[in-house]
Amino acid sequence: MVDLTDRQLFTPFTHPESGVTSYVLTRKVAPLQQGFYFVNESMSADGRYLWFYCAFPPSGTAHCGRTLGVMDFQTGEVRHYPETQFGEASPFVDGQTGNVYWQNGRGVWK
């Protein structure tokens, strides 16, 4: 189970007007890290892997300039995969295996 209060993994941010608290990954592998679009799962069913978008502004675009990163809660490791550049469609995480699938102009990848 993921412990959102673990400050080595997450930094809480409370919005000053709404009072809503969000938990942001403490360790960075990219200048911009963002969760998947809400219709796609970003975590494996066993809670081990949390996948997210990485971006390195000003390079790339939302059309084809983002790559993937993953937090491994078992090892505590956060990794960036620069070879995973994908198109506009959100990647898909297989909840059972933790594998991720993405597409770009050259095909569908795993």
Predicted regions located by residue number:
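Residue-level signal for well-ordered, solvent-exposed loop/turn and beta-edge residues enriched
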Residues: 20, 48, 76-77
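Ligand-binding pocket scaffold of soluble enzyme catalytic domains
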Residues: 42, 46, 52, 62
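Residue-level detector of high-confidence beta-strand sites
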Residues: 24, 52, 80-81
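Conserved core beta-strand positions within WD40 beta-propeller blades
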Residues: 48-49, 99
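Blade/loop signatures of beta-propeller domains
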Residues: 1-23
